[in-house]
Amino acid sequence: PDDWEMLYKIYAETSVRDGFAIRDESYYKTVWSTFNQPETLNLPTCEPLIAEVDGEPVAAIFVFYFGERAYYVYGMSTTNHRNKMPTYLLQWEAMKRAKERGCTVYDLWGAPEIFDESDDMWGVFRFKSGLGGEVVRTLGAWYYAPNPLWYKLYTELIPRVLDVMRSFGKKKT
């Protein structure tokens, strides 16, 4: 989209506020260009939805479409006007658009393993559960380590790598 700089800045603010790591802006541009190919029938299309208050962008989400499924993949919001709950409005709009496109499933993509308030993802789960629907467990994401030595090195470096990735968000806020 034309609003990359603004969207990434809001995403960076969200990552700093909520303490999660993000990738460099070029990663998200690659994801966008890879999946936003409506002329290719085998790939989903995607769209950003942006909420504004008095002309000020305050929240955005990215929704990906594939067949009869819509996927909520990335969400972001500023600290301004959070009391107006723009992220809920965006989800509602995304669900309406998905239905208009013939989607029968709107996938909120991700929940904690155990539903416990001490879990780092509890706030995300609380937000998503407030939208209705049901939790559907799937196989999920897995790591395959063809070389255990490299994997051990990788897993020991992860905290440092995540710190660097978190710094991407701090640089943009």
Regions found by a protein language model. Name each.
Residues 1-83, 96-97:
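A conserved beta-strand-loop-helix scaffold within acyl/acetyltransferase catalytic domains
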Residues 54-59, 81-84, 100-103, 155-171:
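A short, terminal or domain-edge coil/loop segment
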